[in-house]
């Protein structure tokens, strides 16, 4: 009897058992999870990625029903994936939260223009409300002006300080009390290492908290991506074909943070799980109680009613951090003019000094 | 940096203003003698850091507290154990201890406050002869006068398994990261006798290999200290070494162990609260130790160690490039941390001391709610929270449901494949593992060891049960003298 050769379309290569996903054992594995070295398929990857974020949200009680939540949206991959996943989970698990995209326009020419365009497309794609606040509006300075005055070395920290308050101010204007950011496990681990390398004892115990609020701010912040690997966020965005802006902030991190970042890359190359392992370590940190120094342990209670004398923003100090920083910038802008006349004179009142004062204030 | 030091004949020691400087450290120029003094004082300061250690190292006399007989006994019983690895740090520490003994002997007419037992651990037969040779050279060149006060013991750490009355099989369940253990009372379950190298060979990377070896070595040393009533173990760790230990512990998920591993105040509770651990060189950078080592001629006794000449005025000109050829991928976590500190020492000199100081500020972690503090079956570290619970809380272990017929078919094939594997395998590790998963009891492993076990080929290991019997089963040693061949 003649049997027709089977239709070539139906001939499929049978997968080897060892090629199968280690979770469903039925589809081809295409991803090796850095977290636990598991080889999994695309569908299982989507499932575990989304479910783990959901678990993080639920087990840490990040949201309450009816809460209005602002997603700090930069157009980068972390915040784009965050907006997408939050909307998805909110619908899937009925958190009952209201999500608003909140963007800050620092005025970095070439970087911000394009990334803001991305955020605007995201708004259309995800059908979420979008609010944009500019540094120009909030501080009367653009990031490019700041870099010109403060020098490129400090720009990332400046950018961080101003952006942080900008998000808070933006949220406050929208009467939103909760900002979620796309900080991921890699960022978390880097912070743990940095705090140890810099001996930043004041921040050591809290290096890994998922929920924080800065002194002087009524706005709480949370990081639902705390346990998400950067690599998986990128993969998720890639496989879901999400629209994001891929260039990193053009102002490189300050030199020392750069060394820590490279060290972590090296660790990760030989042990991919190390990012989550570092977080596990960080979560166990407890400081010794200093003996005989109890009097030093006076807790400075923050008076909720305090407002910055300059701008009226809630602040535990007379003048808020942003205003301090801007004052420093004004000073150094004046000084730069003087320095042109007296070259070689060491810069005393420069932005670096203001920055140090500011960092102390944070504690 | 070397260019500015090339005219060494112009440099004078800033301490004595007489001799030529041979070392530049902490922005100060030292001659060899003054630098030896500088390092030695820092070590002795640690040795006098509190009452307990003062009682060990000081020469005791009759006073209000003790009779002449008591004082004599106290001097006699002040036994300290010094692990010698033949790296620069332990050689330098021993050298300073020897000087201390000589000085005491001279000023106290032959009396010393303490005696030193040196313990040398090895697991590789080949290195044994070199150790013996170096010890005999060392004794002849340096320690003849203190023959009675410094003794050398050789311990083969392959005794790790022979020396353990009970073995257990520890198996990691991938689905929930729980550890199951089964005591292998009847050792016939395993056909042949286990050796240390067989266990070490299961490690998939060098980092895990070195970690296990380091644990087995440390265990042997502490067990030896326990069995021979030592008052303290003096570890040769430099400040740099401690900094890389702190960072490495964090990176390995063992951050909760930092406070106990830096603890010099309390007795070691895993070993019967009989001795304390001290790091006399913790205020000295490794580059400084290397400079001391070289200038004192101790580099002739190094084994598997390359000295750094960063602080030496006259560079050694050895081929240091050799170390760098080891590719990044082949480095251990500790080596990566060490490299980082070596590079950073130039630009950010205080990072190393900052890390050690910060590590010192860490306390024992708080235990998780409703969690009974237990001890790790593998590394004996205290466990403060349930690692498997933590891992499963952040790791989803179910997949996306099966959808197509093809997927269902694949799944069935996978099931058959596994059944066959189970049926066809003899009583080997795979079978044993399945048996342990079904019949074993839940065991405690710390987070770091859980991760370690996950990198093992079979996700399992056979390990001694760390109990009193094991602690008391005598560790054989071999006394080395100056007349080895
Ligand atoms: Zn799958
Ligand atoms: Zn203000
Ligand atoms: Zn001198
Ligand atoms: Zn352990």
Curated annotation (Swiss-Prot), chain A:
By its UniProt entry, which InterPro entries does this protein fall under? CTU1-like_ATP-bd, CTU1_C, Ncs6/Tuc1/Ctu1, Rossmann-like_a/b/a_fold, TilS/TtcA_N, tRNA_thiolation_TtcA_Ctu1, UPF0021_CS
Report the PROSITE patterns cross-referenced here: UPF0021 (PS01263)
Question: A single GO BP annotation from the record?
Answer: tRNA wobble uridine modification
Protein's cellular compartments: Cytoplasm
Q: Name one GO molecular function term.
A: tRNA binding
Record EC number: 2.7.7.-
* GO CC annotation: cytosol; cytosolic tRNA wobble base thiouridylase complex; mitochondrion; peroxisome
Q: Mind telling me which Pfam families this protein's record contains?
A: ATP_bind_3, zn-ribbon_14
Does this entry carry the keyword Transferase? Answer: yes
Q: In which pathway does it act?
A: tRNA modification; 5-methoxycarbonylmethyl-2-thiouridine-tRNA biosynthesis
Q: Which CDD domains match?
A: CTU1-like
Swiss-Prot/TrEMBL keywords: Cytoplasm, RNA-binding, Transferase, tRNA processing, tRNA-binding
Recorded superkingdom: Eukaryota
| Summary of the function given for this chain in its UniProt record | Plays a central role in 2-thiolation of mcm(5)S(2)U at tRNA wobble positions of tRNA(Lys), tRNA(Glu) and tRNA(Gln). Directly binds tRNAs and probably acts by catalyzing adenylation of tRNAs, an intermediate required for 2-thiolation. It is unclear whether it acts as a sulfurtransferase that transfers sulfur from thiocarboxylated URM1 onto the uridine of tRNAs at wobble position. Prior mcm(5) tRNA modification by the elongator complex is required for 2-thiolation. May also be involved in protein urmylation.
Q: What is stated as this protein's family in its record?
A: Belongs to the TtcA family. CTU1/NCS6/ATPBD3 subfamily.
The record's section on PANTHER family has: ATPASES OF THE PP SUPERFAMILY-RELATED (PTHR11807), CYTOPLASMIC TRNA 2-THIOLATION PROTEIN 1 (PTHR11807:SF12)
Question: What protein am I looking at?
Answer: Cytoplasmic tRNA 2-thiolation protein 1
State the organism named in the record: Vanderwaltozyma polyspora (strain ATCC 22028 / DSM 70294 / BCRC 21397 / CBS 2163 / NBRC 10782 / NRRL Y-8283 / UCD 57-17)
Swiss-Prot record, chain B:
Look up the record and name the pathway of this protein: tRNA modification; 5-methoxycarbonylmethyl-2-thiouridine-tRNA biosynthesis
Q: State the Gene Ontology BP annotations.
A: invasive growth in response to glucose limitation; protein urmylation; pseudohyphal growth; tRNA thio-modification; tRNA wobble position uridine thiolation; tRNA wobble uridine modification
- Claim: Nucleotide-binding is one of the keywords in the record: no
Q: Which Pfam families match?
A: CTU2
Please state where this protein is localized. Cytoplasm
What stretch or stretches form a coiled coil here?
Answer: none
- Keywords in alphabetical order, please: Cytoplasm, tRNA processing
Protein name (record): Cytoplasmic tRNA 2-thiolation protein 2
Question: Which organism is this entry from?
Answer: Vanderwaltozyma polyspora (strain ATCC 22028 / DSM 70294 / BCRC 21397 / CBS 2163 / NBRC 10782 / NRRL Y-8283 / UCD 57-17)
């Amino acid at each position: 009897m003649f049997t027709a050769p089977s239709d070539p379309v139906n001939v499929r290569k049978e997968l080897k058992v060892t090629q199968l996903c280690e979770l469903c054992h039925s589809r081809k594995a295409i991803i090796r999870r850095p977290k636990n070295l598991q080889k999994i398929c695309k569908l299982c990857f989507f499932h575990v990625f989304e479910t783990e974020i959901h678990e993080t949200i639920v087990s840490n009680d990040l949201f309450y029903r009816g809460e209005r939540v602002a997603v700090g949206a930069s157009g980068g991959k972390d915040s784009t994936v965050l907006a997408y996943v939050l909307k998805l989970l909110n619908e899937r698990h009925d958190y009952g939260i209201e999500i608003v995209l909140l963007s800050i326009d620092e005025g970095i020419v070439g970087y911000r223009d394009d990334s803001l365009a991305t955020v605007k497309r995201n708004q259309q794609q995800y059908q979420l409300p979008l609010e944009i606040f500019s540094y120009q509006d909030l501080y009367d300075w653009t990031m490019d002006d700041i870099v010109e005055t403060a020098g490129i070395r400090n720009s990332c920290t400046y950018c961080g300080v101003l952006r942080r308050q900008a998000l808070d101010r933006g949220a406050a204007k929208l009467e939103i009390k909760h900002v979620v950011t796309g900080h991921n496990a890699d960022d978390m681990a880097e912070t743990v290492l940095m705090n140890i390398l810099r001996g930043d004892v004041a921040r050591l115990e809290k290096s890994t908290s998922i929920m924080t609020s800065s002194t002087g701010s009524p706005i709480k912040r949370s990081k639902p991506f705390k346990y998400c690997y950067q690599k998986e966020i990128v993969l998720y965005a890639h496989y879901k074909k999400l629209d994001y802006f891929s260039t990193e902030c053009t102002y490189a991190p300050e030199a020392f943070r750069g060394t820590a970042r490279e060290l972590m890359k090296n660790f990760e190359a030989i042990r991919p799980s190390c990012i989550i392992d570092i977080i596990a370590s960080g979560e166990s940190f407890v400081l010794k109680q200093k003996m005989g120094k109890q009097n030093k342990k006076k807790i400075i209670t923050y008076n909720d009613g305090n407002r910055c004398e300059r701008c009226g923003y809630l602040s535990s100090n007379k003048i808020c951090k942003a205003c301090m920083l801007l004052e420093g910038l004004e000073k150094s802008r004046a000084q730069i003019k003087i320095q042109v006349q007296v070259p070689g004179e060491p810069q005393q009142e420069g932005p670096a000094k203001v920055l140090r004062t500011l960092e102390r204030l944070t504690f | 940096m070397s260019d500015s030091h090339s005219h060494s004949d112009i440099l004078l020691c800033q301490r004595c203003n007489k001799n030529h400087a041979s070392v530049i450290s902490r922005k100060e120029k030292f001659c060899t003698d003054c630098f030896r003094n500088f390092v030695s004082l820092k070590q002795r300061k640690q040795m006098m850091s509190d009452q307990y250690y003062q009682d060990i190292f000081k020469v005791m006399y009759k006073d209000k507290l003790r009779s002449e007989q008591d004082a004599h006994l106290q001097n006699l019983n002040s036994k300290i154990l010094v692990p010698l690895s033949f790296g620069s740090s332990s050689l330098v520490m021993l050298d300073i201890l020897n000087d201390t003994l000589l000085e005491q002997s001279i000023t106290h007419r032959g009396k010393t406050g303490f005696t030193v037992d040196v313990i040398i651990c090895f697991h590789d037969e080949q290195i044994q002869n070199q150790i013996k040779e170096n010890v005999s050279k060392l004794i002849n060149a340096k320690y003849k006068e203190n023959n009675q006060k410094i003794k050398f013991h050789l311990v083969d750490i392959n005794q790790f398994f022979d020396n353990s009355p009970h073995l257990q099989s520890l198996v990691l369940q991938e689905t929930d990261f729980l550890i199951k253990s089964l005591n292998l009372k009847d050792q016939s379950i395993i056909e042949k006798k286990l050796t240390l190298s067989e266990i070490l060979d299961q490690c998939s990377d060098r980092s895990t290999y070195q970690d296990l070896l380091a644990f087995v070595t440390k265990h042997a040393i502490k067990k030896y200290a326990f069995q021979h009533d030592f008052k303290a173990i003096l570890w040769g760790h430099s400040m740099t070494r401690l900094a890389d230990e702190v960072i490495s512990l964090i990176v390995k998920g063992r951050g909760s162990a930092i406070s106990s591993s830096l603890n010099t105040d309390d007795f070691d509770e895993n070993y019967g609260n009989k001795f304390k651990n001290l790091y006399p060189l913790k205020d000295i950078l490794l580059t400084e130790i290397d400079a001391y080592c070289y200038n004192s001629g101790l580099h002739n006794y190094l084994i598997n160690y390359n000295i750094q000449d960063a602080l030496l005025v006259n560079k050694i000109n050895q081929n240091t490039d050799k170390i760098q050829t080891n590719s990044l991928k082949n480095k251990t976590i500790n080596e990566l941390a060490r490299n980082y500190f070596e590079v950073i020492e130039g630009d950010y000199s205080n990072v190393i001391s900052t890390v050690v100081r910060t590590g010192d500020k860490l306390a024992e972690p708080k235990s998780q709610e409703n969690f009974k503090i237990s001890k790790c079956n593998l590394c004996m570290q205290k466990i403060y929270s349930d690692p498997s619970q933590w891992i499963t809380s952040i790791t989803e272990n179910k997949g996306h449901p099966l959808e197509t017929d093809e997927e269902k078919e694949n799944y069935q094939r996978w099931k058959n494949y596994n059944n066959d594997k189970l049926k066809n395998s003899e009583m080997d590790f795979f079978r044993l593992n399945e048996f342990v998963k079904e019949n074993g009891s839940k065991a405690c492993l710390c987070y770091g060891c859980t991760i370690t076990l996950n990198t093992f080929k079979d996700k399992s290991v056979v390990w001694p049960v760390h109990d009193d019997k094991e602690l008391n089963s005598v560790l054989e040693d071999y006394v080395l003298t100056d007349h080895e061949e």
